[in-house]
């Protein structure tokens, strides 16, 4: 049987986490509407609540905000998201468009065409639960066009030397 203190602490932690997620959703909604100043204020309240109660927000909530200016990071609106490989490691690079702060989050590459090992970059804007599985089991769409090998004009066209 669990002690009363551990039961109380668990319910307290649950209440604080619920409030943190509510504040995160509210800040994201304000940022989507273009009220970034208000969204920053709500994000500051979220992190003040976490510090005063000593209940850390989950990683997925912390990564929704810039560590420097507390702007909610929404891809295409307040953040730029890129996937980079460097020195055998792969990173999701998130750049805050408000202050220019760069966040690098390492991830492991999964098998091609299989389920991703780390959450996709599109999940940054969603505050939903991470189920661990993709909802859509179908193909991921047509392959990307363009890139270094598919550029038109200029460069070597693959013929014999001396053409």
Curated annotation (Swiss-Prot):
Subcellular location: Cytoplasm
Top class in the EC scheme: hydrolase
UniProt family annotation: Belongs to the eukaryotic/archaeal RNase P protein component 4 family.
Key words, A-Z: Cytoplasm, Endonuclease, Hydrolase, Metal-binding, Nuclease, tRNA processing, Zinc
Record GO biological process: tRNA 5'-leader removal
HAMAP family recorded: RNase_P_4 (MF_00757)
Gly residues bias: start-end ranges: 152-163
Origin species: Aeropyrum pernix (strain ATCC 700893 / DSM 11879 / JCM 9820 / NBRC 100138 / K1)
InterPro entries listed in its UniProt record: RNP4, Rpr2/Snm1/Rpp21
Function as written in the Swiss-Prot or TrEMBL entry: Part of ribonuclease P, a protein complex that generates mature tRNA molecules by cleaving their 5'-ends.
Region (Disordered): 110-163
UniProt lineage: Archaea, Thermoproteota, Thermoprotei, Desulfurococcales, Desulfurococcaceae
UniProt-recorded name of the protein: Ribonuclease P protein component 4
Reactions the enzyme catalyzes: Endonucleolytic cleavage of RNA, removing 5'-extranucleotides from tRNA precursor
Gene: rnp4
């Amino acid at each position: 049987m669990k002690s009363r203190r551990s039961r109380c602490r668990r319910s307290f932690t649950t209440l604080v986490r619920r409030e943190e997620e509510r504040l995160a959703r509210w800040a994201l909604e304000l940022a989507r509407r273009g009220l970034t100043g208000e969204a920053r204020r709500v994000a500051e309240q979220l992190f003040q609540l976490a510090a005063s109660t000593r209940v850390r927000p989950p990683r997925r909530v912390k990564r929704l905000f810039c560590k420097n200016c507390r702007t909610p990071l929404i891809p295409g609106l307040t953040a730029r998201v890129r996937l980079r490989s460097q020195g055998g490691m792969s990173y999701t690079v998130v750049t805050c468009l408000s202050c220019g702060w760069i966040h690098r989050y390492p991830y492991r590459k999964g098998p091609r065409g299989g389920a991703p090992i780390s959450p996709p970059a599109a999940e940054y804007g969603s505050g939903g639960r991470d189920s661990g599985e993709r909802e859509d089991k179908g193909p991921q769409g047509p392959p990307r066009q363009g890139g270094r090998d598919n550029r038109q004009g200029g460069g070597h066209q693959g013929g014999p030397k001396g053409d």
